[in-house]
């Protein structure tokens, strides 16, 4: 059975056998569809609701 995931930052679908998984020290698993999403969340600490290219932006606006 193939499991599909959603990106933890932008909310986009991640096709099977792609994407990156990040495990925090507390055991939380974060899935990212691209290096861009990973950097924006972990390195730059951006809010996904303020970026136009994320799905959470369209839900808020």
Curated annotation (Swiss-Prot):
GO terms for molecular function: rRNA binding; structural constituent of ribosome; zinc ion binding. Gene3D superfamilies: Ribosomal protein L24e. Keywords: Metal-binding, Ribonucleoprotein, Ribosomal protein, RNA-binding, rRNA-binding, Zinc, Zinc-finger. GO terms for biological process: translation. Binds to the 23S rRNA. Part of the 50S ribosomal subunit. Forms a cluster with proteins L3 and L14. PANTHER family: 60S RIBOSOMAL PROTEIN L24, RIBOSOMAL PROTEIN L24. This is Large ribosomal subunit protein eL24. The lineage of its organism: Archaea, Thermoproteota, Thermoprotei, Sulfolobales, Sulfolobaceae.
């Amino acid at each position: 059975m193939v499991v599909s995931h959603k990106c933890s930052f932008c909310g986009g679908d991640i096709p099977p056998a792609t994407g990156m998984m990040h495990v925090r020290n507390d055991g939380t698993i974060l899935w990212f569809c691209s290096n861009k999403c990973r950097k924006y969340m972990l390195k730059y600490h951006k809010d996904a609701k303020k970026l136009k290219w994320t799905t959470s932006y369209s839900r808020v606006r």
